Structure formats: C-alpha cells, structure tokens
C-alpha cells in the first residue's frame, strides 16, 4: 500500500522566539526613550537601580532559569553578540549558540550586570516564583519571556499592587 503525503508550506503567524518586556512607567520616570541598543538598555538598567524605581527591592532585570533549557532567557542577548562573519555553516548546525564566536562577550556583559546587582540575585536557583513575585509586586523593570506568554498576566497583577500607571511594553530593539 502506498501512502501519499501532502504538506502545505506556510508562514506561521508567530515567528518570534522571545519577547523583551520593559516598564514604560520607569522609562517615563527616567525620561528615557525605549532602548534600541545594548548600551542604551544597560544604561536603563543602571538608572533604574540607582533611582530605586521598585523601592529598596528594585530588580532592574528579573531573570529565572528554565529547567528544560537553562540559557533560554539569555539567548536573545547572546544572539545579539554573535559574530556571523566568523560562523561557518558547520558551526551553525553543530554548536550551541553559547559556543559560537561572540557569545563569550555576551556572557561577560551578563556577568558584569549580575555583579552590579542589575540581575536577580537568585536567578540560578529560581524556578520562577521569585521572578514572578518581582514582576507582580513592581520590583522589576525588565524581563524576557516567550512571546505567547499570557499566563500569568503580570500587567494586571502589577497594576493592582503598584498603580494604574505601571505598564509592561514589548521592547523592539534594532
């Protein structure tokens, strides 16, 4: 018996991998535009910490590790540092992004941010409870999440705890 197989090539509605969410109200309080470069993003994180926009428990970058893929939430940052001129076709198919040329610089930056207290202190042992608390209580100013994340709704919960002007927006870096 012969089975015919058909397929329909399609462009999926959602092609985004991760969403970068930033506090609009914090940008307004800092009189800053949405960051479009790594340097502007780091400046925002530093300014948010210095201004203690989330109070004494301010966490500029709320991060957690994903059990199935611990480096998932850093992949957007790592990918932005990759030196595609040095990545071969073989590299692309045989290496993790974390091993590719340029990734080391991304991890140096993340290490610097952690040492400056700009990343959640316990991110490496957080199953999401601490990060979710920081998001809901208004302590955090930035986080990375899957683009289809609709549960829990951090915006509504944060508004209840912080006020109606508290708002997460999707960051679209260039």
Spell out what each predicted region is.
Residues 1-174:
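Extracytoplasmic/secretory soluble proteins
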């Amino acid at each position: 018996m012969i089975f015919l197989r058909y397929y329909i090539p399609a462009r999926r509605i959602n092609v985004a991998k991760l969403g970068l969410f930033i506090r609009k109200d914090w940008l307004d309080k800092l009189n800053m535009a949405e960051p479009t470069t790594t340097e502007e993003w780091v400046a925002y994180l530093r300014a948010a910490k210095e201004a203690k926009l989330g109070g004494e428990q301010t966490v500029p970058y709320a991060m957690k590790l994903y059990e199935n893929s611990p480096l998932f939430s850093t992949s957007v940052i790592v990918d932005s540092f990759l030196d595609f001129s040095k990545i071969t076709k073989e590299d692309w198919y045989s290496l993790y992004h974390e091993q590719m040329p340029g990734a080391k610089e991304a991890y140096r930056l993340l290490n610097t941010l952690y040492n400056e207290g700009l990343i959640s202190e316990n991110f490496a042992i957080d199953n999401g409870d601490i990060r979710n608390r920081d998001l809901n209580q208004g302590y955090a100013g930035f986080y990375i999440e899957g683009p289809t994340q609709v549960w829990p709704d951090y915006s509504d919960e944060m508004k209840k705890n912080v006020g109606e002007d508290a708002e997460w927006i999707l960051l679209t870096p260039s």
